[in-house]
UniProtKB/Swiss-Prot annotation:
Protein name: Chaperonin GroEL
Quaternary context: Forms a cylinder of 14 subunits composed of two heptameric rings stacked back-to-back. Interacts with the co-chaperonin GroES.
Gene name linked to the record: groEL
CDD domains, per the entry: GroEL
Recorded superkingdom: Bacteria
A GO molecular function held by the record: unfolded protein binding
Any one annotated GO CC term: cytoplasm
UniProt organism field: Haemophilus influenzae (strain 86-028NP)
Length: 545
């Protein structure tokens, strides 16, 4: 086992804080409508230019191992915020930095770290409740557009496209982001169905650059059982090969000899095949297979109704215009199913939703309606260069996640105002169990001004002046850094999804609290390569003597 380097107390915290500040300072320049870009060097190809906080955070690795531990913990904040809400990564980083800096000052002054942490947790819990009270539902197309615009760094075209996409496929529908071919952003709505099952073998991949399987005008074989014997599949494979079309097999599972033979056939180019597991489990799987059958005008091959896979013909297979499969999802686009039958199936599922008493069942049934009736909207991102395309795709992706979060939990005033208002409301009444908890509460509430201050700093104004003016206002009154005007943030269209603001605060406080209570840090001692080389040389000399 390698020897370890151990640091205690203030020595450890100073190093950790340095790492926190390096990472947070790099990330926070991207915050707000006038946030700057960060250029990331890549080991191959052109550098990436981004305004996406989590992309910047992921690139940072520090040489000093103790500093790097601090940086990695803040990186965790950005990643968690990104996973939970898809946006708010920079806000979360700024909050974490503010809480850690304030907290470590208090620890250095002799406060008890555990009580400080309890105070911070109390403040965060109270502010989260207050944010829920301030939250308004996000329902109109205009509000959805505004949320999308803000999250795409004030790009109103992206906001409009997301709003239109949600209007076309419904708020539950599937919206994907792809590279466009021109300079303009476009919205393409395709009828289709997506489910969360990826390819059963990476050898099916025929588009290595995107690690996807794409099948044009494929047949679809739907089977309600495991397939392990290739003999059962031969009649269908021969029929499909003669027809010269690709085949997608959706079954409970494809394994052993059957899967191996399909892979070999695909690699030799004899027949273009892909296999995925059927979505869902038990009765839900049967229902979803039936949904796919109706969408593609196919038949589910099921032994329950006396059908045998060996006797299946091309007439039993469904058809679609295109199928795209990645490691996690399968999307069936433009099935040839009869419109009247699809509508009948949707009506039947809606009836089940009304009769269902379980929230979970209702949610799953609602998903099936969305997949049958909604279709897939594709936002095609246009740009002049590949570097710009990557940067823009990141922003569109963020905006899409933020909009979904807004529809889910509602919206609050943006620009850091909601946190300032919630903190002010809580400050009046919240008290800790002792004086040190009160200090924790105060420092957490003070740190909640950090996003507002950073947005103002990035726009080139004086943060203290603007923060003071906003604190003296009421309700949604705030500062629009894009136009440099004060006013009602919601009327000006500066909105943040409640979920994004809440997640950013909770994750930031969680990790910051752990860092404040750190007393010891342990890492590997760096290896002394020179000493090793010296020893090897001496050994050689010994042999010569």
């Amino acid at each position: 086992m390698a020897a370890k380097d151990v640091k205690f107390g203030n020595d450890a915290r100073v190093k950790m804080l340095k790492g926190v500040n390096v990472l947070a300072d790099a990330v926070k320049v991207t915050l707000g409508p006038k946030g700057r870009n960060v250029i990331l060097d890549k080991s191959f190809g052109a550098p990436t230019i981004t305004k996406d906080g989590v992309s910047v955070a992921r690139e940072i690795e520090l040489e000093d191992k103790f500093e790097n531990m601090g940086a990695q913990m803040v990186k965790e904040v950005a990643s968690k915020a990104n996973d939970a809400a898809g946006d708010g990564t920079t806000t979360a980083t700024v909050l974490a930095q503010a809480i850690v800096n304030e907290g470590l000052k208090a620890v250095a002054a002799g406060m008890n770290p555990m009580d400080l942490k309890r105070g911070i947790d109390k403040a965060v819990s109270a502010v989260v409740s207050e944010l829920k009270n301030l939250s308004k539902p996000c329902e109109t197309a205009k509000e959805i557009e505004q949320v999308g615009t803000i999250s795409a760094n004030s790009d109103s075209i992206v906001g409009q496209l997301i709003s239109q996409a949600m209007e076309k496929v419904g708020k539950e529908g599937v919206i994907t982001v792809e590279d466009g071919t021109g300079l303009e952003d476009e919205l393409d709505v395709v009828e289709g169905m997506q489910f969360d099952r990826g390819y059963l073998s990476p050898y099916f991949i025929n588009k290595p650059e995107t690690a996807t399987v794409e099948l044009d005008n494929p047949y679809l074989l739907l089977v309600d059982k495991k397939i392990s014997n290739i003999r059962e599949l031969l009649p269908v494979l021969e029929g499909v090969a003669k027809a010269g079309k690709p085949l997608l097999i959706i079954a409970e599972d494809v394994e052993g000899e059957a899967l191996a033979t399909l892979v070999v056939n695909t690699m030799r180019g004899i027949v273009k095949v892909a296999a995925v597991k059927a979505p869902g489990f038990g009765d839900r799987r049967k229902a979803m297979l039936q949904d796919i059958a109706i969408l593609t005008a196919g038949t589910v091959i099921s032994e329950e109704i006396g059908m045998e896979l060996e006797k299946a013909t091309l007439e039993d297979l469904g058809q679609a215009k295109r199928v795209v499969i990645n490691k996690d999802n399968t999307t069936i686009i433009d099935g040839i199913g009869d419109e009247a039958q699809i509508k009948g199936r949707v009506a039947q599922i809606r009836q089940q939703i009304e009769e269902s008493t379980s929230d979970y069942d209702k949610e799953k049934l609602q998903e099936r309606v969305a997949k049958l009736a909604g279709g897939v909207a594709v936002i095609k991102v246009g740009a002049a260069t590949e570097v710009e395309m990557k940067e823009k795709k990141d922003r569109v992706d963020d905006a899409l996640h933020a909009t979904r979060a807004a529809v889910e939990e509602g919206i609050v005033a943006g620009g850091g105002v909601a946190l300032v208002r919630a903190a002010a409301k809580v400050a009046a009444s919240l008290k800790g169990d002792n004086e040190e908890q009160n200090v924790g509460i105060k420092l957490a509430l003070r740190a909640m001004e950090a996003p507002l201050r950073q947005i103002v700093t990035n726009s080139g104004e004086e943060a203290s002046v603007v923060a003071s003016a906003v604190k003296n206002g009421e309700g949604n009154f705030g500062y629009n850094a894009g136009t440099e005007q004060y006013g009602d943030m919601i009327e000006m269209g500066i909105l943040d999804p409640t979920k994004v603001t809440r997640s950013a605060l909770q994750f930031a406080a969680s990790v910051a609290g752990l860092m404040i209570t750190t007393e010891c840090m342990v890492t590997d001692l760096p290896k002394d390569d020179k000493a090793d080389l010296g020893a090897a040389g001496m050994g050689g000399m010994g042999g010569m003597m």
